[in-house]
Design a protein with these regions (language model features):
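Glycine-rich catalytic cores of cysteine/serine-nucleophile enzymes that process amide/ester linkages
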Residues: 33-92, 111-124
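Conserved catalytic neighborhood of penicillin-recognizing serine enzymes
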Residues: 67-98, 102, 161-177
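Loop/turn positions that initiate beta-strands
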Residues: 27-28
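Activation targets extended, charge/polar-rich intrinsically disordered C-terminal tails
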Residues: 121-185
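Active-site nucleophile-His-acid catalytic modules used for acyl/amide transfer and hydrolysis
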Residues: 39-40, 88-147
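Sec-dependent N-terminal signal peptides
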Residues: 4-13
Length: 185
């Protein structure tokens, strides 16, 4: 009987590990997922992390949504965002230093996805968006790093894709795992 009870408790705990009530979300929370995009395996290999996509919770007239850079910067319902995660791999994190004023996300809406992973070029990739929103509020959520520091840059297939997209080894970038590690301390 004890063994059965133990197995049931483990199963319940495992199924609830990512249970987040939307009512407990706060503006500025960061949501990480293991994406199913075509570039996700490269990001995973290069950063050695399953967190290959992220977004930030913002307060909209329709309630809390996840602001994400996908094909364009857009608002996505929380359930839909986490529902797109591979194998239900997702988590939320709240930075210790939180944003104290409303996030002005509207200026980012509609910006195209940044295939070159460059800062300040009118396009946006997911972790750049989160990083910039915190920067807009005077908070350095994490440090950027050179593209050359990512393990994936040593893979021939990735190097070829980087050359095609005009990605320099010397340019600065921020990966979802950089934000995750910085706010999970």
């Amino acid at each position: 009987m004890k063994r059965i009870l133990f197995i049931i408790l483990i199963a319940v705990a495992a199924s609830c590990s990512n249970n987040v009530n939307v009512d407990t979300l706060k503006e500025g929370d960061v949501v990480f997922i293991e994406s199913q995009s075509s570039q996700s395996p490269y990001i995973k290999a290069g950063t050695m992390s399953k967190w290959t996509h992220c977004g930030i919770v913002v307060n909209t007239p329709d309630g809390m949504k996840v602001l994400e850079a996908s094909k364009t910067v857009r608002l996505t319902p929380f359930a839909k965002f986490i529902g797109s995660a591979k194998n239900e791999n997702w988590c939320t994190r709240r930075p210790k230093q939180t944003i104290s004023t409303p996030i002005q996300y509207q200026k980012y809406l509609g910006q195209p996805y940044d295939l070159e992973f460059k800062f300040n070029n009118g396009t946006m990739y997911c972790s750049e968006l989160v990083w910039l929103i915190y920067k807009d509020h005077g908070i350095e959520i994490c440090k950027s790093r050179k593209v050359s520091s990512f393990a994936m840059t040593r893979l021939p297939k990735v190097k070829k894709l980087m050359d095609k997209r005009g990605i320099s080894m010397d340019q600065e970038a921020v990966a979802p795992v950089d934000i995750y590690k910085a706010i999970s301390k």
